[in-house]
From Swiss-Prot:
Descriptive protein name: Xylanolytic transcriptional activator xlnR
Record InterPro entries: Transcription_factor_dom_fun, XlnR/Xlr1, Zn2-C6_fun-type_DNA-bd_sf, Zn2Cys6_DnaBD
Keywords annotated in UniProt: Activator, DNA-binding, Metal-binding, Nucleus, Transcription, Transcription regulation, Zinc
Native species: Aspergillus fumigatus (strain ATCC MYA-4609 / CBS 101355 / FGSC A1100 / Af293)
Highest classification ranks of the organism: Eukaryota, Fungi, Dikarya, Ascomycota, Pezizomycotina
Chief subcellular location: nucleus
Amino acid sequence: MSTTSLQHFPHSYSPFSSSRSLNRMAQSQTSGLDTLAEGSQYALEQLQMSREAAGSGEATDSVGKPKDQFQVDNDNHHNNHSLSNFKNPSQRDPLVEARSTIRKNSASAPVRRRISRACDQCNQLRTKCDGQNPCAHCIDFGLTCEYARERKKRGKASKKDLAAAAAAAAAAATNSGQPNGSSGKEDAALVGGHTSPDRRPTINGRYDPAFEVPRNLNGSAQHSEASGMVGMQNSQHLPPHSQSSMGGGLEGLPLNGYNGLNDSGRPSMPVPELQSLHMLHNSHTNPRSPSSILPHHRYNGGYNDSAYSLMNPQEPNSTSISHFRLGSSTENPPNSFLGLSPPAQSPGWLPLPSPSPANFPSFSMASFSTTLRYPVLHPVLPHIASIIPQSLACDLLDVYFTSSSSSHLSPQSPYVVGYIFRKQSFLHPTKPRVCTPGLLASMLWVAAQTSDAPFLTSPPSARGRVCQKLLELTIGLLRPLIHGPAPGETSPNYAANMVINGVALGGFGVSMDQLGAQSSATGAVDDVATYVHLATVISASEYKAASMRWWTAAWSLARELKLGRELPPNTPHARPDAERDGDPDADLSKRHPPPLITSMGHGPGNTIINITEEEREERRRLWWLLYATDRHLALCYNRPLTLLDKECEGLLQPMNDDLWQAGDFATYRQAGPPVECTGHSMFGYFLPLMTILGEIVDLQQARNHPRFGLAFRNSAECEAQVLEIARQLDVYAQSLKEFETRYTSSLALGAAETEAAMDGSHPNHVSPSGRSSSTVESRVNESIVHTKMVVAYGTHIMHVLHILLAGKWDPINLLDDNDLWISSESFVAAMGHAVGAAEAAAEILEYDPDLSFMPFFFGIYLLQGSFLLLLTADKLQGDASPSVVRACETIVRAHEACVVTLNTEYQRTFRKVMRSALAQVRGRLPEDFGEQQQRRREVLALYRWTGDGSGLAL
């Protein structure tokens, strides 16, 4: 068929020419063909058939039409004639007659109509939607019902429209110096967005106000919108199958045979929403922004209906139009962000790989116009708009900072091992902390692992899908810290494969410009915290070996940032934020004490950065968290230490969590790694134990040295180190007793005095103060229980460290007992600590039945404290003492609780092993006793702590 005969097709099936023709089209479509109605060629054929079947009805439809409408009808007649070259109408006469018979027989039946569009929630969940706002499904599940996603359409754009668009763009460039009034009118006429009232767009004969959004803008806004879309087809005013003609006369432009790309029908962005996105305009200056990775000398940022300009880049006239046509360059700076993804596969003449959701996120425009509960999320909103609703993002941020106790801060999420940031700084309604999008995405990902939001629980697969997308987004936003391929070697699926390889096989490299003048100290700290979030969740999964890559990246970056050193003292002069002193709404914690001026970065390009006391404390807490996990994972995976005590001997110890969250920064604290229990948080009771564990790990590595280990084990130096570590454990035990006395006896005494005062002052009636006394008493009781729980956990881990100090970490070596250690005094002392650890585990189960207080850390200490009990049960069997039997029962209960809270393979495996041994202790010997012993040995052989063993990292 000829190209000339097809250039007028958009005129012939414009749905706004007549409302009656639309009704006839809807009635002529049978239910069996509804699914085909979205094809553009099928729409042409059905329109032609319906007009032929209508016959003389066309004459009556023309009554009362305006003059321009007659012109459209004449064009339609001409197009009908030109269609004969495309397909002979006589060949479809039997089909027309058959469909006419079907319409007559089904005239009495109700017309089946499909909804034009499902809401965003139903579309994402693949759920049937009734098309209402809000729809029934969103009402039932309490979801936010929105119709904010982009409209997409099938088929190619008309060559005539594309040529008109290119000509209009060129005309706009030449007429840019005209007065605003004349240019605005011409642009409005070209865009076609301002029609007379009698020609307003309708759908099925009804006026739809959604198409009239640009009419509500003021004059300047209309002009800015029209100038940004000059010569372009304003397709948000049309249904997906319609395109309006822009005029001819441009057939001579060099299109080189390209007929166009899929027009996605994206709505234009209202002007007020552009103002709400001002924080994205500087993304090209942020080296962490994914869009900054793209070459931007030929691209324009923004939005429009056309995905690409179709001019050949090699043509001489292609300089001004052979680039992305995503909006007006006057509204957005070049390459501010590429919010709308290109088609799945870019054309061959455009050298771009297929984008991944992480690097080219889709935008939901309506979400930015609503009020954001937590403004801290602004940097990440453009990236998560197509993943989760805005309200859910705020809820997930609440989940991240939720505490399981009202008396003392304790993270409820098992993947938040300690609070690095202040809750008030993140959730501040007006002046939140400035965060990188990667950190925010990782926080949402961590919270989504355990959130009970309906969006994540219905259907059951929703959580996995959302968490996977958030993980890909987080890794994509950290791309500057991950090695990319060499130029020219990028495959179309590299961005997607990078996510999988980043978790399992990917390498990491630190970009030095991230640590120099182009990056703030907060941004660099945010990157380390993002790695911590990723590593923590992966460590708790079955991919423990893969998590070491993320931990190594976090440790290396923390060392390069020198987080283990204190920054220089405050400088009293030069206060850049002094103008905020008179602001009553400013966050006082940001200004107290005065900030310091320090030099960050490397080399001569150092920059002066303002560091507040809060940012100093964030650096300290991040280092101490990495310090503790380094020692914890050294035990888990049988590896040497990475962060040394020498690197942080001058670093102040972290603050008390309650004071930290309240913004009460302490002026005096001790420096260096702690060895005494000081508080209820991980930094207060667990960090001192990890300091001692680091000494034990160094001692164990020296004992197992392949060349010097034997001489060291028999030397006096080894004995001296053992005695010193034992002394440190005794110091910790004493501090634990003082901690319990301070937070239980004093609180109980204070509560009793308060109750007595209330009883003496109000003997006959209950006052508000009397009613509040019950609340105070409950808070005191909760604080006492929380303190006892901390003491129980600390006691258990302390006993396990005594066992580890003896040097017997490997379960197979214990069962073999080649050195007859079971008959030594050291074994008797270690066995006493094993029973003490089991008794402490019983107290833990009393105060924390589901072991949810510290599930990420507790598993390995429960396991190492159980090996000696397993050895005793295996050797003594029915002759074991009652205390050993009770200890084995407690260990089995504790492992079952651990499996429920944070399910991991090694805990499930060891629970079966302990159950089998406990049955033998009770005298229930199976027939295949030897086979069961061999099976237990094979299972335990998976987890080795010998010289070449990898512990839990299978």
